[in-house]
Amino acid sequence: MKLFFSIVLLVITLDQFTKKLALTFLRDGVQSITIIADLFSLTYAENRGVAFGLEFAPPTVLLLLTGVITIMVLAYVIWSKNRTTLFLLPFALITGGGIGNMIDRVMYGKVVDFIYFDLYQGHIFGRWVSLWPIFNIADSAITIGACMLMIFHNKLFPAESPTGTTDVR
């Protein structure tokens, strides 16, 4: 469990540190710093919703929902007997990211985003779209953790075959 909580703390620390930098250098100043022209920039944005800026509930409900999900993930990891790195890492990334964004909701009433990949901006079917949202370290940790759970699902949660049956192919 030391590994789990170390990763959670690392994600929260990196997330909050980089958000503090974004607040200091991007919010009241230049708003955006181009790193790679037409591809990658640090661009300040405030997100009152969830992923991709979707607003489906008031901020208080989002905070409570995030808190409940985080507690459920923590409880699952603590009560699980699996202590492998492959099991702990994705759940630690998801937990750390969730807590990082919860801190923002409590402190600012919104989540600070600043990482932007300009993959496509333009019209699709007559409607202007920006293909990729502005996001942060916490969002990245949550996404990587969720992808790891999907990719390694069969290793993490092996299906138990009913007794007395064989796998004939």
Curated annotation (Swiss-Prot):
Pathway: Protein modification; lipoprotein biosynthesis (signal peptide cleavage). The chain crosses the membrane at residues 59-79, 84-104, 132-152. It catalyses: Release of signal peptides from bacterial membrane prolipoproteins. Hydrolyzes -Xaa-Yaa-Zaa-|-(S,diacylglyceryl)Cys-, in which Xaa is hydrophobic (preferably Leu), and Yaa (Ala or Ser) and Zaa (Gly or Ala) have small, neutral side chains. GO terms for cellular component: plasma membrane. It holds the Pfam family Peptidase_A8. This protein specifically catalyzes the removal of signal peptides from prolipoproteins. This is Lipoprotein signal peptidase. The gene is lspA.
